[in-house]
Amino acid sequence: MALFIAAPMNPASAQDQPAPKDTIFARKILMGAIDMNMDEIETMLAPEGKLVLADAQEHAETISTMLMAFPHLFPPATNQWKPGADRDPATDTFANPDLWSNFADFYRRATEASKIAWSASQAKRADEFRPLIGQLRQRCDACHALNMKTD
């Protein structure tokens, strides 16, 4: 005699989704990890730094992968920025509400930055790597200037 266990066959409902503050926290963790990897690279590229290309490439590849995932941590329910509100730096968003009305641009920016980081991870020489990291820093700074509220 066979025993069958009935399992629901319907997709996850909204109540099965993480709370918006949990998603905001997750994206802050991911952004912190991107920043940490970028800091490692920029420290190696500083005048007093020592570039170990293989290590820097690994950091760039990690950044590329993280940037591919990053826009997916901005579901509409996390559009919660309010001017003048008291904020918990861990779970409250600083994302500009305009990000969601122009999400395609945000997604494109993250994709382009990911591709630059990937190209850096594949660079064969320091003189190829260095300008790509400069481009990546410019992309990061431009995206932050556009999409991050400072209140």
Protein language model features and the residues they cover:
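Sequence context surrounding c-type heme c attachment/ligation sites in exported
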Residues: 21-151
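Bacterial N-terminal signal peptides
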Residues: 1-7
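Sec/Tat signal peptide C-region and signal peptidase I cleavage site
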Residues: 9-14
